[in-house]
């Protein structure tokens, strides 16, 4: 009888959005327990080796991490399989580079560079608000943080702006119509738009209708929506494409136009 946790992950069973090829080994990095789910995270080794190409293999990644050069959300991380996830800020001390993990329109984590000023904060979705021991109010965010004594106006599904140096809430955005959102799950993953309408379904999933920059409307579940800004203004910089999903023919026409200019 098998006992204990699984310590290995076969390469073919790894999440598709890691973009690992099947023929370069039998195994993939098994994410450590941490703030993000195994299927929704990107281990540090995959980010440094496969995306940034700062290392050729796992041994080189460990050598980089053991020099304490890599910070995630302002904290030094030395675990090569540490699970980084949506909205995390990864800083490389030696090069002065900062990255925010956000999705592209195909639902994959993209290498999105940000300024040092923007790297000082991150956005967190509020998953739970309740009273703790001795009546102390607290909230829990999407990345597992517990913050005591929040603003009483902050409710579930709102987004807080968290200062990574002080770990204090600087501001928050209400989950409401006309708020700007990014979709973090489902077939519309990575798309950005404005909330148009909210459908309530008792005993079932609430449906959110979103309109993107090209006035195309789509719908997704409430749990898949992450508020990133107020009306017409995002609180974070967006990756290439600005979260607008194009059809295959539109992508083809854009490529042809760029070739014609070249």
Swiss-Prot record:
Gene3D superfamilies with a match to the protein in the record: 2.30.30.30, 2.40.50.740, RNA-binding S4 domain
Span of domain S4 RNA-binding: 42-105
Keyword Cell wall biogenesis/degradation: no
Entry keyword annotation includes Cytoplasm: yes
GO BP annotation list: cytoplasmic translation; translation
Location(s) in or outside the cell: Cytoplasm
Keywords recorded for this protein, A-Z: Cytoplasm, Ribonucleoprotein, Ribosomal protein, RNA-binding, rRNA-binding
Annotated GO MF terms: RNA binding; rRNA binding; structural constituent of ribosome
Role noted for this protein: Component of the ribosome, a large ribonucleoprotein complex responsible for the synthesis of proteins in the cell. The small ribosomal subunit (SSU) binds messenger RNAs (mRNAs) and translates the encoded message by selecting cognate aminoacyl-transfer RNA (tRNA) molecules. The large subunit (LSU) contains the ribosomal catalytic site termed the peptidyl transferase center (PTC), which catalyzes the formation of peptide bonds, thereby polymerizing the amino acids delivered by tRNAs into a polypeptide chain.
Assigned protein family: Belongs to the eukaryotic ribosomal protein eS4 family.
Oligomer and partners: Component of the small ribosomal subunit (SSU). Mature yeast ribosomes consist of a small (40S) and a large (60S) subunit. The 40S small subunit contains 1 molecule of ribosomal RNA (18S rRNA) and at least 33 different proteins. The large 60S subunit contains 3 rRNA molecules (25S, 5.8S and 5S rRNA) and at least 46 different proteins.
Name this protein carries in UniProt: Small ribosomal subunit protein eS4A
Species classification: Eukaryota, Fungi, Dikarya, Ascomycota, Taphrinomycotina
Gene name, Swiss-Prot/TrEMBL: rps401
């Amino acid at each position: 009888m098998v006992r204990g946790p699984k310590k290995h992950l076969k390469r073919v069973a790894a999440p598709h959005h890691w973009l690992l090829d099947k023929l370069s080994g039998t195994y993939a990095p098994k994410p450590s327990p941490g703030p993000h789910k195994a299927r929704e995270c990107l281990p540090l080794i995959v980010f440094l080796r496969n995306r940034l190409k700062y290392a050729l293999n796992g041994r080189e990644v460990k050598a980089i991490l053991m020099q304490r050069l890599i910070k995630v959300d302002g904290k030094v991380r030395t675990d090569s399989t540490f699970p980084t996830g949506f909205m995390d800020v990864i800083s490389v001390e030696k090069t002065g580079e900062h990255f925010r993990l956000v999705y592209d329109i195909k639902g994959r984590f993209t290498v999105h560079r940000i300024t040092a000023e923007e790297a000082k904060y991150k956005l967190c979705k509020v998953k739970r608000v309740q009273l703790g021991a001795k009546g102390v109010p607290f909230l829990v965010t999407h990345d597992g943080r517990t913050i005591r004594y929040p603003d009483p106006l902050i409710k579930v599904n709102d987004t807080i702006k968290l200062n990574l140096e002080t770990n204090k809430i600087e501001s928050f955005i209400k989950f409401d119509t006309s708020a700007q959102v990014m979709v973090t799950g489902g077939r519309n993953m990575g798309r950005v738009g404005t909330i148009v309408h909210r459908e309530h379904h008792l005993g079932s999933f609430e449906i959110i209708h979103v309109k993107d920059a090209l006035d195309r409307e789509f719908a997704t579940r409430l749990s898949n929506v992450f508020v990133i800004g107020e009306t017409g203004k995002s609180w974070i910089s967006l990756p290439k494409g600005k979260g607008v999903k194009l059809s295959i023919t539109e992508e083809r026409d854009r490529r042809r136009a760029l070739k014609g200019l070249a």
